[in-house]
């Protein structure tokens, strides 16, 4: 009988063989490290561009908010650091809080209208035939793709006091008092037109997203609900709504951000008038900073606007997460 015993390594070459090939193992580890770093290297250009285009303006705005920077200091290239004086002046004034409440109400009304109208159109798209769905989606995409300034200009023409189409139609329908009505003459009428404009531009995004969400719902679930005797409303609440809920959360979150900072529509339509009664926070920051040449004050208002928006979104996300935990 022959007994074979394992011979211990006798030299460096045997040690390298026992370690798994020496150079081959080192190359494998190096390749593994390179593979782990590859995603970060690919993300580096995008991250650098984000920091350059978004991070630096935020830092610059934050620095300006601690300075007394008016036209005199700007011409003389003088930097006057004032600490939190700009924030104290803004927070102790009535205008900021009045504009803040107005901005929150304005955002809430527009978001609710946008989500309701967009949700109904999205559900309608799911039930239309192919041709009608295609035509409606073309119209939605065209409305969504129109530049904001161009859309605002069109609405200025539509609601013009003397030659506007809206006043002409209302006059022909019997409302003769509207023939020469000024839509920019009061706070309510101005906000009404701006709200119609914002909802008109925001609905396509909501409708198309919700329609896309309905295409992910299996038909078997509706068939099972019908076999259980569920009607249209029960099928919607038991089958459709649970699938749409994540899309509704995400879409609402985005709409809150976009509408809260709707500067172009409000400022282009009437410049925050009449008598600055339709100013929301972005318009208020621009008028104080650029219009009145109080650049430090405008920067402080902009920083506070960002903080308020972060607070609103954090509160909304907290509600969403709590609802998801309750469902689990």
Swiss-Prot record:
Residues 1-27 are annotated as: Disordered. Residues 100-316 form the ABC transmembrane type-1 domain. It holds the Pfam family BPD_transp_1. GO terms for cellular component: plasma membrane. Induction: Induced by (GlcNAc)2 and (GlcNAc)3. The complex is composed of two ATP-binding proteins (MsiK), two transmembrane proteins (DasB and DasC) and a solute-binding protein (DasA). Belongs to the binding-protein-dependent transport system permease family. This is Diacetylchitobiose uptake system permease protein DasB. The gene is dasB.
